[in-house]
Amino acid sequence: MKRTIIMMLDSFGVGASADAASFGDVGSDTFGHIAKACAEGKADIGREGPLKLPNLARLGLGHAAMESTGAFAPGFGDNVELIGAYGHAQELSSGKDTPSGHWEMAGVPVLFEWGYFSEHQNSFPKELTDKILARAGLDGFLGNCHASGTTILEELGEEHMRSGKPIFYTSADSVFQIACHEETFGLDNLYRLCEITREELAPYNIGRVIARPFNGTGQSDFARTGNRKDYSLEPPAKTVLDKLKAAGGEVVSVGKIADIYAYCGITKKVKANGLEDLFDATLAEVKSAGDNTIVFTNFVDFDSHYGHRRDVAGYAKGLEYFDARLPEMLALLGEDDLLILTADHGCDPTWQGTDHTREYVPVLAYGAGLKAGSLGRRNSFADIGQSIASHFKLEPMAYGESFI
């Protein structure tokens, strides 16, 4: 029975990529800087001491990062019995965003330029927002800027509740984000507003509209809920997910995967929020998955809760939790199953600002007859998609080189 399980650690980069200078990210290193902070006792909130990831180390994480950066991260070295194949991959796509990374790892790199709202203030064209407001029956909006999602709630959340005006904001990514209170504005109203915005953005080539619902009574207790929803464009070509579905296979999305691919190639969507819930749901789907199935999970907390918020200790604690549960996954795998652990970009929690970082991503592969050892530097995330196509004996993808 052949299956593929993809555990996507959102934002878990392993060192600045060769083209990082074009993004202002030379020197960034999500994994390495977390390990360094832990070793120096600078990440002892909710955990303590050096970064402890013994299971990821056995799968080759430390070695993949060493090949990426030229040195082992603090606390990692050769004194480990490797059980997996490991490498690191360069992104071919033009951006360091979520859709680009996900589509490329499924065999479809983004070779065009996304549209962006580059102005930090008055970010959105008036012509665009006027159309959105008119269709939605709203008399105004708040924000209109680049912002951290948590900071903008502190600044504008109470005014939003008083006025009923949605909060529009963006970032360095190709994204239009809308934050609204679940109770005072209404979740369905937020989703409808996002659908309108997605339609009006057609001429702008923006990758995603993101619904950012929150709750709470005031500035001190505002918090995002688990009802985030991404409205993505469709990938520009058929991904390996589409190809497996067309061949009669199953593709199970856990978390926000379905949204990122605009539901293309997805046969089942499982909603889950938080590391524990996402891991539980992944295990449950693997237990019930039949032949010719992909189970694909995005562990978004690493990015949204820790990377963007520049929370080094939180990121480290999350990684250690994930690592401690990996034996549960390994115990479920048959001899023909393929497990892949990777990331879609970096988001170094020690870096300036709050945006993603252009980094190599780890490619850790286990099972399906793969020998433990180095896969080297992969020239594209698409090598993952090509390898999955090879594993299922599908028609080859247009991009990528299989490591199987």
From Swiss-Prot:
Protein residues bound to Mn(2+) 2: 303, 308, 356
Pathway the protein takes part in: Carbohydrate degradation; 2-deoxy-D-ribose 1-phosphate degradation; D-glyceraldehyde 3-phosphate and acetaldehyde from 2-deoxy-alpha-D-ribose 1-phosphate: step 1/2
Protein residues bound to Mn(2+) 1: 10, 344-345
Record-level Gene Ontology MF annotations: magnesium ion binding; manganese ion binding; phosphopentomutase activity
Record keyword Metal-binding present: yes
GO biological processes: 2-deoxyribose 1-phosphate catabolic process; 5-phosphoribose 1-diphosphate biosynthetic process; metabolic compound salvage; nucleotide metabolic process
InterPro entries: Alkaline_phosphatase_core_sf, DeoB, Metalloenzyme, Phosphopentomutase_DeoB_cap_sf
EC number: 5.4.2.7
Catalysed reactions listed for this entry: 2-deoxy-alpha-D-ribose 1-phosphate = 2-deoxy-D-ribose 5-phosphate; alpha-D-ribose 1-phosphate = D-ribose 5-phosphate
Enzyme class at the top of the EC tree: isomerase
Record GO cellular component, one term: cytosol
Keywords: Cytoplasm, Isomerase, Manganese, Metal-binding
Cofactor annotation comment: Binds 2 manganese ions.
Cofactors named for this entry: Mn(2+)
Subcellular location: Cytoplasm
Highest taxon in the source lineage: Bacteria
Entry-linked Gene3D superfamilies: Alkaline Phosphatase, subunit A (3.40.720.10), Phosphopentomutase (3.30.70.1250)
Principal place of residence: cytoplasm
Function field: Isomerase that catalyzes the conversion of deoxy-ribose 1-phosphate (dRib-1-P) and ribose 1-phosphate (Rib-1-P) to deoxy-ribose 5-phosphate (dRib-5-P) and ribose 5-phosphate (Rib-5-P), respectively.
Protein family according to the UniProt entry: Belongs to the phosphopentomutase family.
Protein name per UniProt: Phosphopentomutase
This protein's encoding gene: deoB
